[in-house]
């Protein structure tokens, strides 16, 4: 926590859990004098600040799993009531997430064709890029799966796809957390929120996306059944769908993805500590 060396608009500034790992979530908490509007950047991502009940302003920002480890800027910008601007900048360390690698057998090469995957990814990005000021969750996130401690693939692993004995290298990583479990098992909402997408996509299969507020979104891929509708408010633990094998899969499982201000982060972090 910094309290000295700050411009006069700032009372204190805290960056939680330094250094931040690849795939981690940066938490920036700032106290200012009254009437200040906050902005800034972490790495190269614009920060969105929201007021907590005690008056502290907080921003949450995901760090990309493929961002090279190193030193990156954090800048805080304060706009005063008279329109003047004060800034505070420091450098923070991003460290390796120590993610492994895996080879994925694939039956249908079309599901990794960029002409298929890129438009679908952009559709998801457009959904999760809307930042709502409502905060719907008020406790630690809970596992969405029936088998909470059984994973078939962790977040962050580098992936190579194998099609009939030919390995196809597509630059990328596993963007979520895959849980064990077969067709028809229930999927629970890890935290409260509002359903902003519910439908079928080519790669992700039957998809539900929940807005938890403050730029935090959960995505659930490959479902056999969707049991919620767009616009519906869901509570933590509510059953929102059933595990399936739709889309680009090697078998039925739950893929849970967590986005924080436009970046996919490691969902396990959100299961072991409370944000913000």
Regions inferred by a protein language model and the residue ranges of each:
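Short polar/acidic secondary-structure junctions
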Residues: 64-66, 184-185, 200-201, 246-248, ...
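Conserved, short, structured surface segments that act as functional micro-motifs
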Residues: 151, 206-212, 216, 232-276
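Short, surface-exposed secondary-structure boundary micro-motifs
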Residues: 31, 182, 200, 238-239, ...
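Cationic-aromatic interfacial patches
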Residues: 2-90
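Surface-exposed, glycine-biased beta-strand/turn segments
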Residues: 88-204
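Zn2+-dependent peptidoglycan hydrolase active-site motif and core
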Residues: 189-227, 252-257
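Short, well-structured beta-strand-loop connectors
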Residues: 186-196, 227-243
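Short strand-coil-strand connectors
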Residues: 41-45, 79-82, 192, 211-214, ...
């Amino acid at each position: 926590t910094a309290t000295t060396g700050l411009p006069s608009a700032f009372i204190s500034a805290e960056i939680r859990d330094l250094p931040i790992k690849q795939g981690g979530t940066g938490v920036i908490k700032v106290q200012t004098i009254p009437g200040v509007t906050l902005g800034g950047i972490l790495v190269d991502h614009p920060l969105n600040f929201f007021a907590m009940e005690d008056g502290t302003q907080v921003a949450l920002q995901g760090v990309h799993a493929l961002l090279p480890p190193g030193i990156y800027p954090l800048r805080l910008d304060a706009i005063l009531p008279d329109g003047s601007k004060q800034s505070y900048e420091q450098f923070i360390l991003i460290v390796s997430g120590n993610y492994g690698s895996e080879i994925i057998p694939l039956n249908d090469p079309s599901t990794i064709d960029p002409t298929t995957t890129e438009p679908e990814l952009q559709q998801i990005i457009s959904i999760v890029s809307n930042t709502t000021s409502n905060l719907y969750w008020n406790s630690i996130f809970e596992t969405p799966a029936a088998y909470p401690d059984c994973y078939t693939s962790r977040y962050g692993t580098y992936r190579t796809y194998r099609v009939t004995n030919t390995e196809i290298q597509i630059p990328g990583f596993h963007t979520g957390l895959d849980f064990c479990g077969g067709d028809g098992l229930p999927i629970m909402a890890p935290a409260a929120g509002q359903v902003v997408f519910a439908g079928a996509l080519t790669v992700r299969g039957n998809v539900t996306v929940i807005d938890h507020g403050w730029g935090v979104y959960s995505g659930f891929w490959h479902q056999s059944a969707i049991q919620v509708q767009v616009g519906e408010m869901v509570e933590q633990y509510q059953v929102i769908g059933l595990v399936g094998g739709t889309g680009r899969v090697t078998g039925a499982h739950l893929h849970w993805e967590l986005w924080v201000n436009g970046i996919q982060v490691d969902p396990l972090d959100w299961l072991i500590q409370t944000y913000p």
